[in-house]
């Protein structure tokens, strides 16, 4: 039995039943280093390197209605948002919702979702171990992206 099954069993024993548990949590996905190459716009650059690298990953996760969660950096914030939004619109179908934070560790504010007075951990796929540590310290489930196969295996283990 895995942790999620244990949680479900305990909830059932306590009379806490969520019809569709996975509708109560969200999947967030980083852009740079996960779906596109590092682009530099979040460091104040022009974002010239916009190669899309995440087609296999995206095709496998889009059924979970992921939300793109990306840092803009403190320089050229509006330009970074514009470039990243265009990348999402150009490469990801169906086009997902996009959320921005200024710095990567700030992503932690999205780590949990409250539904019917219950708090559920959200999942973040990110290539930054620092971002994942911050996410997990705020109650979320973090998956450090190294390659598509390992990320998908980890994700499936949480969503079984």
Give the residues covered by each predicted segment.
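Acidic, Mg2+-coordinating phosphoryl-transfer loop and its flanking beta/alpha structural elements
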Residues: 120-157
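Asp-based phosphoryl-transfer active-site loop
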Residues: 22-40, 135
């Amino acid at each position: 039995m895995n942790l999620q099954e244990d949680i479900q069993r305990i909830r059932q024993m306590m009379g806490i039943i969520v019809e569709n548990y996975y509708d109560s949590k969200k999947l967030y996905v980083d852009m740079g280093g996960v779906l596109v190459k590092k682009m530099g716009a979040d460091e104040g650059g022009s974002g010239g390197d916009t190669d899309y690298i995440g087609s296999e990953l995206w095709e496998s996760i889009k059924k979970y209605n992921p939300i793109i969660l990306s840092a803009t950096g403190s320089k050229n914030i509006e330009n970074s948002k514009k470039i990243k939004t265009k990348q999402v619109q150009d490469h990801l179908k169906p086009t997902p919702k996009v959320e921005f934070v200024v710095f990567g560790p700030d992503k932690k504010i999205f780590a949990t979702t409250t539904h019917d007075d219950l708090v559920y951990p959200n999942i973040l796929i990110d290539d930054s171990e620092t971002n994942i540590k911050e996410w997990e310290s705020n109650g979320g489930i973090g998956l450090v992206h190294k390659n598509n196969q390992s990320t998908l295996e980890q994700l499936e283990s949480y969503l079984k």
